[in-house]
Amino acid sequence: MPSDAASSLRHADTDENVFRRNERVLLLAPSQGLGGGIERYIGTVEWAFADQKVTSQRVDLNRSGLRAHLKMLADGRMLLRASPERTRLVVGHRALMPIATLLAREPTVSGMSVLCYGDDVWNERLRPRRRIERALMRRPGVRAVAISGFTAGTLASDCQSTILPPALSQKWFETLVAASAAVQDLTPVTQLVTAFRLEDWRNKGLPQLIEAVRAQHRKDIRLTICGSGEPPPDLLRLVSTHDWCSLRVGLTDSELAIQFASAALFVLATRTRIGRHANGEGFGLVLLEAQVAGTPVIAPAHGGSSDAYMDGVTGVAPVNESAEALATAISEMLEDPARLASMRRHAAQWARESFAPESYPRLVASKLL
């Protein structure tokens, strides 16, 4: 059933630049250990390089501020100067473009690829920093790589881009599939799950999701919030007021996979905004993870998540971002057990076929090197 654009991309042009595998890569990453879709995406790119026997080294920006940026620059220069090999810079976030541009002056650097996601692209473009990033991305030797067609379209007024849709590493993929097989019978409790970096709980639409669950007036529904990072006090207060709501922090991959596989529905209710405090999903990798685990999804009403599921087949999206629209989407799914069971089967089949990890490393090499 893999007929969507993301699946087609996965099998297109996989031989392009295949003979450039011996090129070394220096990966500039915006964080490590903070969790979230961007970190998972970058980790999968690292796995793909290793699979293709591309030498890859990584430098992380673990803190904000000038000192941390200068340290990243110094660490990058040290690694580049330690080897005479030709090196491609892979920039894990466009905010790191100033550092990458300085590193590109090193004689061993042979161009760069910059990964673009969602709100990093449609944030307020008139801010001085955004103007600088946009100018740097237009320089010769810079290749913009978007996570989805939606993000690529948003980038179009800034620069041309290619698309590298997300996928899952072989190990993570197999963990999710195994969790699906291990969960044989759903309990009488109707489990809903959402997952995100906990500091982003408002942007991920948790208040609207909680209100939508309350509107179901069903005693059998439970909502589990899986997250990484330290939970903010206001989030803890919100969760504590609902005995059907629980918070699971810092789960291992195996534990997270079981949460996905055990759920009747996975819900991602991300809010979409443009401007100075932009927010939104460029793809929604966690939607793909849930479907590989065999769970149908409710996706954000707006943004780039349409590439991450098959509408009406493996999941749905509410008509808008209101709690009322989300409540309607949830109730329509839960009140039709036959449809929900069909979606579970199709979610697993579609996600595992369309995003099979075997072909992804070659695609990464062709798009980034």
Language model regions located:
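Donor nucleotide-sugar binding/catalytic pocket of nucleotide-sugar-dependent glycosyltransferases
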Residues: 139-182, 187
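Conserved donor-binding/catalytic core segment of Leloir-type glycosyltransferases
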Residues: 182-204, 210-214, 224
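A short, well-ordered alpha-helix in the C-terminal region of glycosyltransferases
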Residues: 332, 339-354, 360
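Short hydrophobic beta-strand element within catalytic cores of glycosyltransferases
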Residues: 287-292, 296-299
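Conserved acidic donor-binding segment of nucleotide-sugar-dependent glycosyltransferases
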Residues: 310-323, 332-338
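Nucleotide-activated donor-binding/catalytic signature segment of Leloir-type glycosyltransferases, i.e.
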Residues: 233-260, 265
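Acidic donor-binding loop of glycosyltransferase active sites
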Residues: 261-280, 295
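A conserved mid-protein helix/loop that constitutes part of the nucleotide-sugar donor-binding site
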Residues: 40-44, 199-215, 233, 324
